[in-house]
């Protein structure tokens, strides 16, 4: 019997999980873009050297991505060992604590605190990543997996881009109260994600007796060897990694590029992200066809 992938959005086995991962992606990017907005506000106020703005804008994505390289193999083991809905609740609780630290950084306008919080956000996202994908085969039927994955990618990508828009507009809309608005926004979004995570049904751990290997190097090498042996896995890893690498680098530099090289305003930046969002959403939905 034919079914629509959107039918999954009416089911408790999928909707809370879908909402949580979208909240997480949205908040991460609100936070990152609010940092860029703060940099612009500090330059305008004369409290930061304009040359440092570009440096921090380049540094922020690297700080966020670094934990993926360091801890992905360990995070994957936790996803195998821990009951999945419990692990999601743990990661969303971590997000509340991390965003509380970020709020302090915004209020103090202290980039050191914000970069520490950004690194911690990367750690939290690294821990959430494996369970985000490994939970789907446990809650979806085989014929629902392609459509379900498409919805997740659509939700994630659009949440990322909308988060960038929202975060970028915080200081433009709130003006001199931008730091307070950013602090409140990231904490409230983290709390919302944690509350929704409590509705995710229990999903048993895949390997509850697994012994965690804390050295990430041997585990990472073993994963790479496994991916090398399986062509489909290798190509999937390379494709997804390249998409997020190029997307993160391009969108992270888009605000400065639009202003400095194109002579545009915030409107041009918003328009470019909106076009990209439409393309990502359309592609994700078409993957089931």
Residue locations for each model-derived region?
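Helix-to-coil boundary motifs at intracellular loop junctions of multi-pass secondary transporters
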Residues: 38, 42-43, 81, 135-139, ...
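Transmembrane alpha-helix termini and helix-breaking/packing motifs in multi-pass membrane transporters
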Residues: 34-47, 102-108, 162-186, 260-261
């Amino acid at each position: 019997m034919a079914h629509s992938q959107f039918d999954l959005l009416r089911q408790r086995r999928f909707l809370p999980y879908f909402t949580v991962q979208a909240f997480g992606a949205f908040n991460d990017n609100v936070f990152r873009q609010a940092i860029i907005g703060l940099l612009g506000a500090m330059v305008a106020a004369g409290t930061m050297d304009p040359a440092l703005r570009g440096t921090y804008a380049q540094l922020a994505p690297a700080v966020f991505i670094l934990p993926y390289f360091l801890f992905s193999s360990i995070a994957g083991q936790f996803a195998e060992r821990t009951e999945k809905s419990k692990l999601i609740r743990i990661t969303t609780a971590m997000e509340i604590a991390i965003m509380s630290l970020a709020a302090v950084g915004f209020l103090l306008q202290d980039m050191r605190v914000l970069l520490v919080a950004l690194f911690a956000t990367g750690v939290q996202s690294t821990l959430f990543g494996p369970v985000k994908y490994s939970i789907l085969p446990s809650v979806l039927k085989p014929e629902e997996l392609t459509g379900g994955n498409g919805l997740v990618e659509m939700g994630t990508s659009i949440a990322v881009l909308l988060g960038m828009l929202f975060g970028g507009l915080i200081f433009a809309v709130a003006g001199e109260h931008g730091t307070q608005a950013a602090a409140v926004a990231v904490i409230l979004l983290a709390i919302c994600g944690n509350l929704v995570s409590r509705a995710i049904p229990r999903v048993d751990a895949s390997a509850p007796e697994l012994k965690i290997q804390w050295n990430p190097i041997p585990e990472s090498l073993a994963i790479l060897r496994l991916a090398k042996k399986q062509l489909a896995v290798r190509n999937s890893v390379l494709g997804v990694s390249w998409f997020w690498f190029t997307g993160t680098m391009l969108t992270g530099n888009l605000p400065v590029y639009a202003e400095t090289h194109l002579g545009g305003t915030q409107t041009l930046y918003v328009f470019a992200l909106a076009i990209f969002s439409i393309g990502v959403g359309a592609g994700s939905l078409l993957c089931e066809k």
